Amino acid sequence: MKSLNRQTVSRFKKLSVPAAIMMILSTIISGIGTFLHYKEELMPSACANGWIQYDKHCYLDTNIKMSTDNTVYQCRKLRARLPRPDTRHLRVLFSIFYKDYWVSLKKTNNKWLDINNDKDIDISKLTNFKQLNSTTDAEACYIYKSGKLVKTVCKSTQSVLCVKRFYK
């Protein structure tokens, strides 16, 4: 095998530095492109597309208006539920979506229920207990409107917001 003279070796050295730089840049750009292409698989979001993430919960404005029965069904289809009346997130949700929306509080036969699961609710633990306790109707459903729970007819149509915890 022939040995290379000094000039040839010098030329190889001069050419190898730019080639090495190009290879490094190419590798970095390729890595960035791969990351961007597979970012959903590499770094999954806690909430699906369209859902808004806030304090370990995901919220979805369905942009539809329904009665309470249909609302519960719609949220269940999405593996979610209606916002509870005792959550501290109600004001934040109102400021984000700026809509009146159903909450999971219903009065039926003078019993207070969570319509997500039909379990009894102790309304004395709710912040607006006095306002709710003054309700004389045998049946009423509630929406969150401008900072407070407001009684409405259960068959009326109101905006639907669904909520679920991360990764469910």
Curated annotation (Swiss-Prot):
Signal peptide: none
Keywords: Disulfide bond, Glycoprotein, Host Golgi apparatus, Membrane, Signal-anchor, Transmembrane, Transmembrane helix, Virion
Domain of life: Viruses
InterPro entries: C-type_lectin-like, C-type_lectin-like/link_sf, CTDL_fold
Occurrences of domain C-type lectin (ranges): 54-163
Pfam families, per database record: Lectin_C
Topology term for the membrane: Single-pass type II membrane protein
Intravirion face of the membrane: 1-14
Function: Forms a complex with OPG162 and OPG190 to coordinate the incorporation of OPG164 into wrapped enveloped virion (EV) membranes and, subsequently, the production of actin tails. Therefore plays an essential role in efficient cell-to-cell spread of viral particles.
Name of the protein this chain belongs to: Protein OPG162
Gene name in the database record: OPG162
